[in-house]
């Protein structure tokens, strides 16, 4: 068990809590007898059963609280109880040293010498949370619900059975009700058996469907059945229409053995290890800065203005009247190919994750469901100040909770998972609230006169032409204007802010194509903003003002740091410039000044603070036994290399930290860093490596350099060896940092810096 004063990794990064029974299932009426306690197989017995009622996850935790909440137990007692339990089993005890509650979780055997991890629980006025985590819950039961991964250990489905378990208290762990199968690994759920049905049942259609689709949970047999389904249909699906499903790494096993199957068929079953998903690796830094970011929006060069976008499916019923489409009619695909594509899309991991996220958000008994349903009720009740900002904060919190719930299934990579969850939240929250929010924005902007000033600015711009903006550029033909108008109409129909930004990028690309044909390749913001303002006036869509505010407030902050945020700000600046035409001003602001003023106001309110990203360092770890891995560590400003080395020893679980050290990998060589050097003042032309110091001469040279310090003439030699610092004294090492230059449209993001870190590991 870990030291009580030293917290382990985040529970989501290791093993999820699985003491609570499996999925919420309704009790089906049965003629079997029902007793007050379940038998060892989890089968109910006793008298007649009560009417069907769902036992929620929160109710199970509340009823069985005397079993898992052991405030009188110490660390040794928790270790004694959890040593024979399967991974994921948990207890809550009280720490005598910290005077707070501690969540003890059983880890897998392969996780290291310590098979029990302790996580301290912090209590505040806003609720409870794990130490180092920003996820806040109302109470302890709500916290455990947020981190529980449902797994059917006990099939207790009634209140009587749960109360019988509750009466045992601490004795439950050694009782006959706590049964564990010793013949198989505890972390591997059993293979479900298929129930054979008679031909009469199949003809009548009273049973289930003929095709079995594996649900999202537990998910161990998902790729196997998916592969069988693909092999059962002799249909060749082209790469253009097939879903991104990959075959399993090993040949699929046969169908689970039915009752009465011969032993020879049983011997052909592969071992259970082949069905296991790969374990999660890496380290999740607490806080929003370390959560998986959404993939960036496509750049202006990557946007295809002529191809249909996926956001076309997100139109709302209350869309404005559209003009005739200018695109050529689509060719209808063959029926067989369409059917095969539809079947494969049902099995796509994105659809499975989306359906699971929707079910969690619709279930009020879950933590994320309660958050989403309360948000919908609150917004529908009436307007509040800073309403859109509150909705964005609730969406970010709900996405973090969904990621914690669905992330351990490893169906999707982290970036793709965050994107799918964000789309699911938009569909479940923003789609029903879209008409309400649009009506409130329109009412507010009409009351303060913003829409009236914009409509008057549109009229003046159409009358004066390009001269109203001090420019001579315009679109050459009405067809180009109509194409841009169609993109903006699609923007008005969409309810998802990310889809709206994609339509905006397509419209801006059309404008830039026309701009380059007139002003050349060197055209910039001073030429683009007048052209955008003129085209907006010709399109005559005043609702773009409320859509600009809708996108600016509800778009994920990490998506505002690229070209999408740049052109969204350009749209806001252009609308502000048009609104100013109706005011009696002798000399309006120039387009560049108007854009800079709008950018400055927007950055202060919406973009994430840069200081929250500048304390993250990515360190690679060379383990002689398991190979290379890397983690992103939160290092406070002003920390030394000695402090960072201690943090690396803790996070990488090094048993002999004195034998390891931090090295700077540069010029095909390792250079050990002195302990007194500052972690954030390292050069940017290398990579941080935490490895074993195997060569004594390296240690001696480093010790000699450490003695000299930075006062003597040797300090310059060390700076020259390690690359030195820039003149501003800022760190230039390849770490996960973001700056304000990226927020203004820079193309270098944190994901590219992480990719550089992975290249260092390969070297």
From Swiss-Prot:
VPS9 domain mapped to chain residues: 445-587
Which Gene Ontology cellular component annotation is one that this UniProt entry carries? Answer: cytoskeleton
Pfam families documented for this protein: RIN1, VPS9
**Keyword Cytoplasm listed:** yes
Q: How is it modified after translation?
A: Phosphorylated on tyrosine residues by ABL1 and ABL2. Phosphorylation at Ser-340 by PRKD1 induces interaction with 14-3-3 proteins.
Sites where Phosphotyrosine occurs are at 35
UniProt biased composition (Pro residues) = 245-257
Q: How does it assemble?
A: Interacts with the GTP-bound form of Ras proteins (NRAS, HRAS and KRAS). This interaction prevents the association between RAF1 and Ras. Interacts with 14-3-3 proteins YWHAB, YWHAE and YWHAZ when phosphorylated on Ser-340. Interacts with the SH3 domain of ABL1 and ABL2. Interacts with RAB5A. The interaction with Ras is probably regulated and antagonized by the interaction with 14-3-3 proteins. The interaction with 14-3-3 proteins is regulated by phosphorylation on Ser-340.
Biological role:
Ras effector protein, which may serve as an inhibitory modulator of neuronal plasticity in aversive memory formation. Can affect Ras signaling at different levels. First, by competing with RAF1 protein for binding to activated Ras. Second, by enhancing signaling from ABL1 and ABL2, which regulate cytoskeletal remodeling. Third, by activating RAB5A, possibly by functioning as a guanine nucleotide exchange factor (GEF) for RAB5A, by exchanging bound GDP for free GTP, and facilitating Ras-activated receptor endocytosis.
Please identify the protein, giving its name as recorded: Ras and Rab interactor 1
Species this protein is from: Mus musculus (Mouse)
Q: Which gene encodes it?
A: Rin1
